[in-house]
Amino acid sequence: MKKVLFMASEGVPFIKTGGLADVVGSLPKCIDKEYFDVRVMIPKYSCITEEMKEKMTSKTYFHMDFNWKNEYVGIMEAKEDGVTYYFIDNESMFSGFRPYSDNVLEEVTKFSFFSKAALSALPLIDFRPDVIHCHDWQTGLVPVYLRERFQGSEFFRGIKSVMTIHNLKFQGKWDVKTVKSITGLPDYFFTPDKLEAYKDANLLKGGIVYADAITTVSDTYAEEIKTPFYGEGMDGLLRAREKDLRGIVNGIDYDDFNPETDKYIEHNYNAVNFRKEKIKNKRALQAELGLEQDDKKMLIGIVSRLTDQKGFDLISYMMEEMCQDTVQIVILGTGEEQYENMFRHFDWKYNNKVSANIFYSEALSHKIYAACDAFLMPSLFEPCGLSQLMALRYGTVPIVRETGGLKDTVEPYNEYESEGTGFSFSNYNAHEMMATIRYAERIYYDRKREWNKIIDRGMAADFSWHVSAKKYQEMYDWLIG
């Protein structure tokens, strides 16, 4: 039995702020339990719900030197869906109403503590992993500590580490002097070939330098981050380590996202009866959001953080023109104020055509995936993207820009070969996006049978975690040897 431990800053169902939690909570369930024992370790935030805290039992505790203090470290344990979770507890480190704050120094301190405490806890929980699988900058110090601080102990000798980059933009940077003091690492770690990058200490860089293998969340993104445009200052290092770098596309939980059993949607449906049943969800959503009741009008959905990365500057530029077309547009999400206000304005101006929902609701997101005809994702960059996978699962045709995971998961429609699962454009250009939306409109209105075939192919595609899990298993086997 090979043993793997995921170390991360969040994981469903205990705590979630984004797609990272879905990966950490879903992937371990799908890895073959006959050959692998996969467990998860995350912080015990005080903002975890009481219902979830009640599932935890105390395992043990110890004290650890950190940042010139002797800190308490509690270890809690819980079982969920057949997976063992461990929680690192320290009230002062993990207090607050949210898992993350906007104070970068606070975040760097908190996750430096978590990295050291998580490794220090292993001998006490009677679990010696063959591989520690780290996720994003919050666990970037784990491979560093493992190689340089813990390898002297017999227990840790030979443990391998994997660093998964979910979004290279976030790196955990702070000034060298402070990070040196917090981590207790000596001077020779803070050089350009180790943790120092552009005069700052960089926690993600530490993980990339010291991990035995590096993964990211799609094949295309793995190639993109080796270029200056997408590399966020790390492209040189990633090119140097390209033999150890691989892309593995994320999956989605096919039990949670299943139009046949989804409790949030008005009318359940499947790949066989969607032609009759999906339209009922459209009517229900139009009624709920106060849009004009019209079965035939193309309904375009957007569920996203409203930021530049997600392509909202393109949408902002073209929104007036889109509203002149025979379409309805539903938006769900929060983000930059300029985009929130832009959508509010168009909701006011075209009240029966545009519905701006500037908040987040799990229930409404499911209703949008089920009700819409098309789903728009014109991202500037997208490491993997999960929304397009949910759209495909629900028979909602994605319109995307060809970048990262969007390029890997949405096959562009080809009317001559009658193939493809969505529509895509390659250049980051508002007019090219608009031309692609209009092309999709044309197929939707003039060639309904073709449109339904696109839906058929999208719903038949398999982006469940089981496909990704096999690739992770191959990597663990390769590492363990």
Report the location of each language-model feature.
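Catalytic cores of nucleotide-sugar-dependent glycosyltransferases that transfer UDP/GDP/TDP-activated
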Residues: 1-481
